[in-house]
Amino acid sequence: MGYNKGDNYEQNIFDLLTSKGLIATGSTRGGAGNATDIKFPHNFQEYNLEVKLDLEADYGQKMMKWDNGIWGWCVDDAVTSFYTSVGVLDIVNAKNFIPNRYSIARDEITTQQKNQDQKAFEDKVEIDINSLYDFYGGKDCYYIQIGGYGFYHLKRDILSLGTSQFDCKMKLRLRAKTIHSSPVYKYGFYAVLKVDKKEKPKKSCFDIEQKDGREFPPII
């Protein structure tokens, strides 16, 4: 459901930009892949835009696996490379525990053993916001639209639009998450990056949706 809402919001932003003639003919959205969500034109060049439904949206939930005593990623991609660069694998491997999920025959795992895995694995770690800027900078993406908060720049305002920087604290959450309540072994280990809700960013004065009196960003 969370993905569907986020996808619908991205489509809404895409449609708003299209209605203003700011989407090139034949362009499509990035969707759930690693591509940047939307491209918008400015002074005859295209620029990347990340789109998030709200502050609750995550910046990439990734599943982990334990193999021969070492934690790694189930699938390697740009986001897992980013997570590795900020020390996620080091943090998890430093926990130095043997997960029941990978060391006991799956049909023999008890609820108590699942709970032990959750207690040993789960954690929250603050991540430097500059790491997020660098991640998007590496994708040549310098702007972000967040539902209810507006349009910001990330690492820098490369178009000199006068935008505010998306500046807040980020938390990396490690979860041993239930996939299905039955059988018991249906749970996995995940890393996910989200905004720390205790220190929310100040709302932008620009907003593609133009809500609450915010102005459309000067990209036309």
Regions found by a protein language model. Give the residues of each.
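Residue-level detector of beta-strand structural context in well-folded domains
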Residues: T36-I38, Y142
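Nuclease catalytic cores
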Residues: G6-E10
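Charge-dense, extended regions
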Residues: C205-I220
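Conserved catalytic cores of phosphodiester-cleaving nucleases, focusing on short active-site segments
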Residues: I38-F40, Y47-L53
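Active-site metal-binding core of divalent-cation-utilizing nuclease and nuclease-like domains
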Residues: A24-N34, P41-N43
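Catalytic cores of nucleic-acid endonucleases
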Residues: M1, Q11, S19, T25, ...
